[in-house]
């Protein structure tokens, strides 16, 4: 990270969408390899799809100066916040950015009863990450022939 300038987690803007898409394609490539499938939803997304989430959901980005290091989305559905596409740039992983983004999206929704997400079972480290942060495995879902998802939930502590 840049010396003297702290990491900032702030709302994403429409003009962030191309950089967000480029970063998520790099970051989700290992998942595609592990699954032996390019059917990973973040790899199928478009700039327009990201812009739609920026318009309709809570989309946060992690910035180090002018550099985008990560992002996360929170989509409200009743008393639930669906966490989608938590992503950290490959060269910035392992430094706590994912945990900071997860905490920020949870903090952005103080009245929510629960948080839910899915993550690829092939990415064991990701499943462990969410378990460490208070999420419980609810069930496993078959997304496609090659992709099995962990459906996880965390009850909000308020």
Tell where the protein language model's regions lie, with residue ranges.
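Conserved acetyl-CoA-binding loop of GNAT-fold acetyltransferases
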Residues: 110, 131-140
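Conserved acetyl-CoA-binding loop-helix of GNAT-fold acetyltransferases
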Residues: 88, 94-107, 128, 132
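A short helix-loop-beta-strand connector motif used in the catalytic cores of GNAT acetyltransferases and
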Residues: 48-61
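A short beta-loop-alpha structural element at the N-terminal edge
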Residues: 8-22
